[in-house]
Regions:
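Intrinsically disordered, low-complexity coil segments
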Residues: 9, 131-132, 401-404
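Secondary-structure junction/capping motif
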Residues: 14, 44-50, 373-377, 557-558
């Protein structure tokens, strides 16, 4: 299950009928500005920059315009079909774009270099709908197109570079407009989002740039035009603060259909060399996007998958790995690749907490909740790869009560190497039985092991309940709590018209973090020097309120903070290398070695979309 804002596999957007409805609704709600009666008015002889205006919303939204002229700079024959036009004679205002998208719904009949005149309606299209919080795209809809001439030179591109993009990300949203920036005058010399908005629809170019987001299944990648902006050691751009965004990131797509020219495969750290040029679009999945008419060449910089050190005899190695909806119907190749990573890249950890193990029938919604076949297929693959014969513990969830892919019943599972560590089974619990902490002579113990933490708490509604287990290594008890907190689904993107964007999903994770924190406090209250590890897909950053709640009272420390800033990430989303997966330690875990093992997130070819985490210490 993707941990950042999810999207469906189908990227084609049917919007010809939706455009007017969206705009009318937005105008009525006062979200986009303009007059709801403007559709009854006409405007003749206007230029593109008149339509674009000096804010994010056209001053002519809803109006019928006639005689709008420009040169075609790009044609899109798939997805949101249409073409871009640009006025070759720019005005003197840097806030007004000279380019504009023309939505045709069917395959356009114009070609790049055509000079055209259009009669159309000015609309504001919100990719993803009003509830997404996305900015709107100013466009012409229902066009009547007249080709005036052909073979004209395309207007010279505006170069987007480290020097042209401001370091400040966005203005603070207008409190009177609910935190929206829609009505604020653009200041392209002060803010990156304003700069990109001032180029909406314009023919732009970038020079050779570093890839910071690998090619994905939707034929897109991310680059940065700011080579030294929060650079990671492996070539990415680390995301380290809500207050300091990475303004050099830019999404790249191609206007050439894949059947004619495959999209290049790139990993983080590769170079997109030469010139990449085309109209600047705005879409639901990343905001401002260079839709390339001319696409540069990817140069492989040889990024390699990392391998962690093997634990010493007296060290306990604990790892966490989100294996992305693993179920028995997945190809054997996926199981083998994941198993090879456990053995080779993770050096066969003593305890491995897995997230997103699905039930025995996967996404088939047939009431199955057991996952023994899924786990057996995986542990068999690990043995075949030369790894240990792991044993396992888990608690089956209630059917369709823990979120994730419907029917899949994802859950956390403990694997452990019985040659190195033992598991303390104690009144094994079920999906609704809560484990608690008890004590005897200064030592803590779980009432149920494996058991779930506070499963009736509403914080876990439609979400994975934490799995707590009690292990023994060299005579010392170690408590491990495997987690998979609620996803970021529903959060607004970084390019939202709300600045700062709304992060609504954070509220649930905050409650989840408080529940886990309270449980750890119970353990530490009974055994001050207890070894407790809270591991898993926390789905939130090391600087987030979620992590702050987990660490409340000093009972936990986010081990990822022991790494240099440029190594703190487990996931790459929209060109940001960021932390989602974590291992947190109790005060009893005094000395440890931590490793975020980068084997997936930076690569176009992934076994999972997450990087596993490993912590080694001496209990």
């Amino acid at each position: 299950m993707p941990s950042s804002i999810p999207r469906s596999a189908g990227r084609t957007v049917a919007r010809s009928a939706a455009v007017s409805a969206v705009v009318a609704s937005a105008l009525a709600a006062g979200l986009l500005g303009g007059s709801s009666s403007a559709a009854a008015e006409d405007a003749a002889g206007v230029r593109i920059h008149d339509i674009q205006g000096t804010t994010r919303v056209s001053p002519l939204v809803g109006k019928q315009v006639t005689g709008v002229t420009g040169i075609v700079t790009g044609v899109r024959t798939y997805g949101s079909r249409g073409f871009w036009i640009q006025d070759p004679q720019a005005d003197a205002d840097p806030a007004t774009s000279e380019g504009l998208f023309v939505f045709t719904s069917s395959v356009p009949t114009v070609a790049v270099g055509d000079a055209v005149s259009l009669n159309a309606t000015v609309t504001e299209y919100v990719p993803g709908g009003l509830n997404s919080g996305n900015q709107s795209l100013t466009q012409l809809s229902k066009p009547v197109v007249t080709v005036l001439s052909q073979g004209n030179a395309v207007p010279a591109p505006v170069t987007i570079s480290a020097w042209s993009v401001p370091d400040a990300y966005a203005p603070e949203g207008d409190p009177a407009a609910g935190g929206s920036v829609n009505g604020l005058p653009l200041d392209p010399e002060a803010y990156a989002l304003d700069y990109y908005e001032s180029l909406e629809g314009t023919n732009v170019r970038i020079g050779s740039s570093r890839v910071v987001g690998a090619t994905d299944p939707y034929a897109e990648l991310w680059v940065t035009v700011k080579p030294w902006e929060n650079r990671t050691m492996r070539g990415g751009t680390v995301y380290g603060s809500y207050e300091s965004q990475n303004t050099g990131r830019l999404q790249i797509q191609s206007l050439t259909p894949l059947a004619q020219q495959p999209f290049p495969e790139a990993n983080v750290g590769d170079r997109l060399t030469g010139t990449t040029e085309g109209p600047l679009d705005f879409n639901q999945f990343g905001g401002y996007t260079l839709t390339a008419r001319t696409l540069g060449t990817v140069v492989d910089r040889g990024l390699e998958r990392e391998t962690t050190d093997r634990q010493h005899k007296n060290e306990l190695a604990v790892a966490t790995y989100n294996v992305e909806n693993l179920d028995p119907s997945d190809p054997q190749e996926k199981f083998d690749a994941l198993a090879k990573a456990v053995v080779d890249n993770l050096a066969s950890p003593d305890i491995l907490a897995l997230e997103e193990i699905q039930d025995n029938t996967g996404a088939k919604n047939d009431g199955t909740v057991a996952a023994d076949l899924t786990v057996k297929k995986f542990t068999d693959a690990i043995v075949a790869a030369g790894g240990p014969a792991y044993e396992w513990r888990s608690v089956d969830p209630e059917n369709n009560k823990d979120g994730g892919e419907p029917g899949g019943n994802i859950r956390q599972v403990f694997l452990f190497n019985p040659e190195r560590v033992s598991f303390t089974d104690r009144a094994s619990g079920d999906a609704t039985t809560a484990t608690a902490v008890t004590g005897h002579k200064g030592h803590a113990a779980l009432t149920v092991s494996p058991g779930r933490i506070d499963p009736a708490n509403t914080a876990w509604e439609s979400s994975r309940k934490p799995l707590a287990g009690e292990f023994v290594f060299r005579g010392r008890t170690v408590f491990v709590i495997a987690n998979h907190f609620g996803s970021k689904g529903g959060d607004e993107g970084l390019t939202s018209h709300h600045q700062p964007p709304n992060r609504s999903s954070e509220a649930k994770r905050l409650l989840q973090a408080q529940a886990v924190n309270a449980f750890v406090k119970d353990v530490v209250a009974l055994e001050k020097q207890a070894d407790v590890l809270v591991v898993g897909d926390i789905n939130d950053f090391e600087f987030s309120e979620t992590t702050r709640a987990l660490t409340d009272g000093g009972v936990l420390y986010p081990a990822v903070k022991s790494l240099p800033r440029g190594e703190r990430y487990s996931y790459v989303y929209q060109g940001n290398s960021q932390v989602l997966d974590q291992i947190l330690t109790s005060p009893g875990v005094r000395h440890f070695t931590y490793d975020s093992v980068h084997i997936n997130a930076e690569f176009a070819d992934q076994d999972s979309d997450h990087d596993p985490q490993v912590l080694r210490f001496r209990p």
